Structure formats: structure tokens, C-alpha cells
């Protein structure tokens, strides 16, 4: 459709001289500006995010651009500004070239209008605009009928293994980084961890491609459609479903979360409250503990992990059981950030993002070593997972395609002998459910499945069933699901 749109637009340019009045030509040039701007903007989105303009992009801008440090996107803003100036100049030149040669021909003027309208109607921006209406007005009953057979009400039982959990989410970390054939010597620590179960065929579910949605999808085994200024800030948002953290809390676990960025960004604080976390730390809280080194997004990973270590020791001594959830920041798109501790590492690449990847490998690897060498190791399992693959990068040397890269998901436990590799198909919805399954608590949670015992959902990771469920998330009723099963 894009090719048809561009063809019709080019034809309309040749027909513009038949508008015969300068004010009509002025209106036409203004419409040309709008069309070209839409087309260029959509093309940029396609290059960087792999998606046309639509609801996903609006949500991404709303949650991941607004409130983000401007310096991080300085290059993109400069390019966009230059593009806008270039389009304006093109339209001015177009007007100046055509206006002296206007001629009167109503038939050809009509064709100009026709081709320009077709160009707009076949523009990807217009085509995807209808998605907004469908999202805000879902056929709830129809979507329930489609999704309920696959949604599983979580029924927990006392854990067979009652250990503390350190759950580490690696920001924008592709599994391909661990592949020595693709990136030799890039991740010597994380690639060589032992006493683990390594799940090698995990894909990211559609519409969980940025941090908050990645965390939600992992915790809850389901995703949600972002509703602006509405449900997500409600204290009761998503309380109609149960997620992994709440289930652990019911089992007596103390819930702790920390990341280097501000907890207000992407409404992380509200998410944690909804998920019943007891203790939360972000940039503001970390800076209150003393001076820290900062990057554009927040506290650097070396300082954050130092605080995390001290808190791990404190929690191990004070709490019977706890979940310590950590989110790194060094590999945040588009270029990553280098912690001061990593400045003298023997980097295998001078690329900014790959240096950040290697730094994260070093810092997280050392953090894991400290836990495993401590007196608390036997009573602790460590989970490694990326929140989502790298969405985009300014780097020309990062050859990993986020669409094709698998997710990282590992369970580390001293009780595991060697390395157990599981190549069973799974999704990011299955990770937290599998951790609960490893502990013996449950095997099914919403769309999540315990990959140690049962198969994942029989759908591709971008199947519409996930999107339909996300659009009616706040309407899902466990009572309705169980009543359907009983009947």
C-alpha cells in the first residue's frame, strides 16, 4: 500500500499546475508538506522500531520518550528537525516553480484531488489510525469467548523448594550477545555460568517490547493495552488478575525491587504497588543513600548493584524469604552507558552499545559471583532474564536483529548439577510461571506455563489472541473462567 500511496502522490505533483489559482496551489503545497512529513516519520519508525505508526508507537512515545532524558535522543531530534526543514524547503520550491505556470483544466485538477486523496488514504499513517478505535472499543464478549479457553486461573500451593529469589532483568539484552560465534568474547561471565537451567528458545510476546510491559508480561503471564490517563493509575488496576509477585507474597515472601532509573518513569511505582511490592528503590531513593555516579537515565549499574548486594545481605539476615527484583540500565537504547568500574575493561569492540553489553556482563557476573560465594548461596536461586530485546540502536555494528534474537532466561541454583539446557518453545509469559513451577507452587498462571512440566501456549508470539486478551484485561473475570470450565 505504501508504494501505491507514493505513486499517487507523485502523480498528483505533476497535476498540481492545473489548479489555476495560487491559493489552491498554496493549500496543495501545505497538504504535500503534511503527506511527506507523515511518510518520512513512518519510514523512520519502520527503520528504528520495525513498526508503522500506530497504537504501539503512540504508547512507546508516551511512556518511553516523554519524561526521558532529551540528550539520549539528541541525534534523532536533530535529524528530525533537518528533515522537517528539508520538507518545508521542498514545498516552498514546489510552489515557486509551479505558480508562474498555472493553467486552467478542471478535469486534470479533479484528477489531482483524486490522486492526492488516494495517496492519503493509502498512507500507512491513515491505515493504522483505525487501530485506535478498535482498541478503545473492543467487543468484550467476543474476545472473552476467544481467550477464556486458554487463560488459566492460578491456584497456588505451598512451595516444595523455599529459597530466596534474586530476579535480575537485563535491560534490552539480546540472547545473541551470549553467542560466541556472533560476538566472540563479548560476554565471558554470563555465557559461562554453571549450575543452571538454560531456556534457549524463549521469544518475546507481542506488545511487551518496552520495559514496563516486559515486566508486566513476565510477572503476570499476560499483557495489557495502555489506556492513557485512565486504568493504569487506578489503585485497583489489574487487581482482577493475580500475578507471580502476589503469589509469592501469599507464600510469605517479602517483595523488593530496585532499578537505577526513576520509579516515576513509565509509572513503575504504580506497577510495583499493584504487584504488592513492599520495598522499592529507584534513582531518587538511591541518591538519598549517598553520592552515586549517574548517566542520562539514572544511577549507573555498578553503584546500583553495590546497594543491591548490601540489601541482599540485609534481607538474607532479616527475612525468612524474599524476592529481590533488579533491573539494570547500562544497555538502554540507543547507545548504552558505561559504568565507571568498566572503563578499563579490555573491550572487544569500540561500539558504544557493545561496550555497554560487555560492561553489564562483567558487573552482573561479579554480582552473581558474590552471591554464590556467600554464606547465603545455598538458600538462594538467581533468575536471569532480559526485560525485552534491544528495540533499536544507533550502532551500525550491532548486527543482531531484535525480531530474530531469542530471550535470555536462566534459573541458577547450587542444587542444579552442571547445565541443563531446555530448547522447548516458550515465551516471555512463561518465565515467572516457570520459576513458580520450579519452586513447586503452580504450573499455570494466565497465559504463562511452567516449561519444566507443560508446553507453552500453542500460538506464535505475535498471535492476535494475546492482543485480544490485552484489550480486555480489566474485564477478565476468574469467576467467569472457572464457571465456563465447570459447565
Which residues does each PLM region occupy?
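Short extracytoplasmic/periplasmic juxtamembrane "stem" segments immediately C-terminal to an N-terminal membrane anchor
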Residues: 61-64, 136-152
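Transmembrane and membrane-interface helices of multi-pass
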Residues: 1-136
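A sequence-composition feature that detects small, non-aromatic residues
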Residues: 16, 28-30, 68, 74, ...
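Basic, amphipathic N-terminal segments that precede the first structured/catalytic domain
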Residues: 118-139, 289-300, 304, 308
Amino acid at each position: 500500500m505504501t508504494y501505491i500511496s507514493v505513486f499517487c502522490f507523485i502523480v498528483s505533483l505533476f497535476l498540481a499546475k492545473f489548479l489555476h489559482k495560487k491559493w489552491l496551489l498554496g493549500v496543495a503545497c501545505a497538504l504535500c508538506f503534511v503527506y511527506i512529513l507523515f511518510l518520512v516519520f513512518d519510514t523512520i519508525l519502520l527503520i528504528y522500531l520495525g513498526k508503522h505508526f500506530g497504537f504501539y508507537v503512540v504508547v512507546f512515545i508516551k511512556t518511553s520518550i516523554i519524561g526521558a532524558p532529551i540528550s539520549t535522543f539528541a541525534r534523532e531530534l536533530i535529524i528530525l528537525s533537518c528533515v522537517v526543514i528539508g520538507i518545508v524547503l521542498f514545498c516552498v520550491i514546489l510552489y515557486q516553480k509551479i505558480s508562474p505556470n498555472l493553467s486552467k483544466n478542471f478535469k486534470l485538477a479533479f484528477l489531482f484531488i483524486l490522486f492526492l486523496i488516494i495517496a492519503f488514504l493509502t498512507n500507512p499513517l491513515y491505515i493504522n489510525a483505525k487501530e485506535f478505535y478498535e482498541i478503545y472499543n473492543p467487543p468484550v464478549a467476543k474476545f472473552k469467548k476467544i481467550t477464556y479457553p486458554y487463560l488459566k486461573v492460578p491456584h497456588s500451593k505451598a512451595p516444595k523448594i523455599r529459597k530466596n529469589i534474586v530476579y535480575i532483568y537485563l535491560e534490552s539484552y539480546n540472547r545473541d550477545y551470549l553467542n560466541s560465534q556472533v560476538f566472540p568474547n563479548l560476554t565471558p561471565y554470563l555465557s559461562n555460568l554453571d549450575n543452571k537451567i538454560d531456556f534457549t528458545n524463549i521469544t518475546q510476546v507481542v506488545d511487551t517490547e518496552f520495559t514496563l510491559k516486559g515486566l508486566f508480561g513476565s510477572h503476570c503471564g499476560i499483557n495489557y493495552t495502555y489506556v492513557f490517563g485512565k486504568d493504569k493509575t487506578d489503585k485497583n488496576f489489574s487487581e482482577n488478575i493475580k500475578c507471580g509477585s502476589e503469589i509469592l507474597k501469599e507464600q510469605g515472601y517479602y517483595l523488593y525491587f530496585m532499578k537505577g532509573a526513576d520509579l516515576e518513569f513509565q509509572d513503575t511505582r504504580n506497577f510495583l504497588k499493584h504487584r504488592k511490592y513492599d520495598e522499592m528503590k529507584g534513582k531518587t531513593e538511591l541518591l538519598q543513600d549517598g553520592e552515586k555516579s549517574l548517566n542520562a537515565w539514572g544511577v549507573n549499574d555498578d553503584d546500583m548493584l553495590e546497594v543491591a548486594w548490601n540489601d541482599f545481605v540485609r534481607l538474607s539476615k532479616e527475612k525468612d524469604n524474599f524476592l529481590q527484583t533488579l533491573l539494570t540500565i547500562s544497555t538502554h537504547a540507543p547507545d548504552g552507558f558505561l559504568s565507571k568500574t568498566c572503563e578499563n575493561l579490555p573491550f572487544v569492540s569500540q561500539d558504544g552499545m557493545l561496550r555497554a553489553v560487555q560492561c553489564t556482563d562483567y558487573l552482573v557476573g561479579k554480582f552473581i559471583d558474590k552471591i554464590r560465594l556467600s554464606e547465603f548461596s545455598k538458600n538462594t536461586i538467581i533468575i536471569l532474564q532480559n526485560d525485552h530485546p534491544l528495540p533499536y540502536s544507533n550502532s551500525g555494528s550491532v548486527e543482531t536483529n531484535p525480531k530474530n534474537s531469542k530471550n535470555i532466561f536462566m534459573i541458577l541454583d547450587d542444587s542444579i548439577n552442571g547445565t541443563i539446557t531446555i530448547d522447548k518453545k516458550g515465551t516471555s509469559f512463561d518465565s515467572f510461571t516457570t520459576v513458580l513451577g520450579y519452586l513447586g507452587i503452580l504450573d499455570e498462571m494466565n497465559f504463562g506455563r511452567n516449561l519444566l512440566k507443560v508446553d507453552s501456549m500453542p500460538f506464535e508470539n505475535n498471535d492476535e489472541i494475546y492482543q485480544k486478551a490485552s484489550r480486555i484485561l480489566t474485564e477478565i473475570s476468574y469467576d467467569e473462567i472457572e464457571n465456563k470450565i465447570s459447565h
